[in-house]
């Protein structure tokens, strides 16, 4: 399928209770930006692997570059939280992939894994990695009959239900919506929902299961 369909299929997987990741590069990601923005407004987890290559345009499609950080950081119309992980080694790539799914599920936000062509073309044997044999249980709830997908929450994180798991309807919509998921243009609801979504920026910074770390020299500009 094309990139537009791919990211929407991924969002459908998360909506149904699964775990999905899409992988692309350059212009392919440009086609995914509307789907990325959709993930932002419906507060859906999503994992996106963006393999950087030299642009603009087709650029140098078989060479390496690290020029897409701003693209990942600001892609998608409108303002919504996202996280970006950038592995520098194959070992870190495995770890980042695991953590990306945990972080996306915990924050109900898109999470990027940002790599470059050099890393993707690399290959060597690795020692056994301490990765779990099975993924953690998804953070979904059994819905009550009066379930509201976007219920107000102090940290911006509403309980995430999925269709068929409980008694409630799980409404999602790319238009602005109220707590129950119904389309609205009321200014006070718009302000409240924007503030709710942006609260998750603090959540992304402070999630205890994803401690801050720094790999590489303490001062990369001089070392």
Explain the meaning of each model-derived region.
Residues 26-27, 48-52, 74-78, 111-114, ...:
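Short, surface-exposed, polar/charged, turn-prone segments marking secondary-structure boundaries
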Residues 96, 101-223:
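Flexible, low-complexity linker and terminal segments
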Residues 70, 75-79, 86, 125-136:
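Metal-ion/cofactor- or nucleotide/acyl-coenzyme-handling active-site neighborhoods
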Residues 1-74, 83-104, 221:
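Thiamine diphosphate
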Residues 15, 74-81, 171-179:
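Short acidic (Asp/Glu) and glycine-rich catalytic loops that position anionic groups and cofactors
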